[in-house]
Regions:
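N-terminal presequence-like segments and the immediate start of the first folded domain
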Residues: 1-56, 60-73, 79-127
Length: 127
């Protein structure tokens, strides 16, 4: 049985409460990422900017794990406002133009009022 491996990024200080992602075999489980910029930590001004921030951060995490957005299998999205869904979908489509992963989108309250979106993904590392 493969051993669980923690994926860390060099650009951010490790969070003592969670890992950006874990690898198990050829699967990568990315923790929920929010609308903060992956380098500066600043929160995006609207749903479009926050969605881009999240997906760019996920892209970096997947690269550190040895895979890419092309290999995302599932996406779970939490939006704080249902009315943001159309704008979210437009930004999301830029990152997944074809071979879209299975996706669940729900409306939920997040841990900070300025955050509008949180995304969790599972990806694979191709053989």
């Amino acid at each position: 049985m493969p051993k669980k491996e923690i994926v860390q990024l060099k650009l951010e200080a490790p969070n003592p409460n969670l890992s950006p992602a874990t690898k198990f075999g050829n699967l990568v489980f990315v923790a929920g990422q929010t609308g903060r910029h992956p380098v500066t930590g600043e929160v995006g001004k609207d749903i479009r900017e926050q969605t881009r921030n999240v997906l760019e951060h996920i892209k970096l995490i997947l690269a550190a794990a040895g895979t890419s957005m092309d290999n995302v299998l599932t996406v779970i999205t939490h939006l704080t406002k249902r009315e943001d869904l159309a704008a979210y979908n437009e930004e999301y489509a830029k990152y997944f133009p074809a071979n879209k992963p299975a996706r669940t989108t729900v409306t939920a309250m997040l841990n900070a009022p300025e955050l509008l979106v949180e995304i969790t993904v599972t990806a694979c590392i191709p053989d």
